[in-house]
Amino acid sequence: MYEISPQHDFLVGIDSDGCAFDTMELKHKECFIPNTINFYGLQAVSKYAREAAEFVNLYSKSRGINRFPALVESLEWLQKRPEVKARGVTIGVPAAVKQWIAEESKLGNPTLAARVAETGDAQLKQALAWSEKVNETVAGMVRDVPPFPFLRESLDKLTGRADMLVCSATPNDALTAEWAEHGIDKYVAAICGQESGSKKETLTNAAKYPRNHTLMIGDAPGDFKAATANNCLFYPINPGEE
């Protein structure tokens, strides 16, 4: 987990997808969902698989959660669809992945790869292969997506007044590439993605600042929960009205 050395009296955590960049729809609809359909054999119910995944990742209270819990939740919703049952399609929810999620706080490919090496579990191997392919697809697809209007100006205003952290469930490599592509990585003390731990863990850095001097900017209930768990103020970004 990243440990900040405070340089200013204030700390601002910034979620990336959906807050700094308009990338949520692009990543999920063009990168995550096609790979979920392919890797989990959902071709016969692709319409409903897409609906379930879009609901979980974009349009529900689960918006913005880590990819692995989102995968499990999407499959669980899909299991319940009568249209899926009517087609005789059996949806399996990977129990080994659920167990790993329950036991691990740094839900990323490195820790999953370590568990695969330790156990050789087929469900974990499948989830790792899916996640690696998602990363590959994101790297090939996501480009030329500028920050939201006035994001740069907002960062300029915070510079010299507050320490800033990217606080995201996206892999570090993708975050670093996206922030560097547009020259805004210079504004933040660190980029803390899924390999750094959960958003709640990253925001434990708030304890180093005076009360009411810490803020999380997020677009999902999970961001709010991470903020309140660390006594941070919260600024909500309303999806669709960024």
Each predicted region: which residue ranges?
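Short coil/turn segments at beta-strand junctions that form active-site/ligand-binding loops
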Residues: 8-10, 162, 211-213
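Short, surface-exposed acidic
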Residues: 40-57, 82-90, 185-189
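Short, acidic loop-to-helix structural element flanking the phosphoryl-transfer center
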Residues: 113-116, 121, 136-165, 201
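Substrate-recognition "cap/lid" segment bordering the active-site pocket of phosphatases
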Residues: 165-215, 229
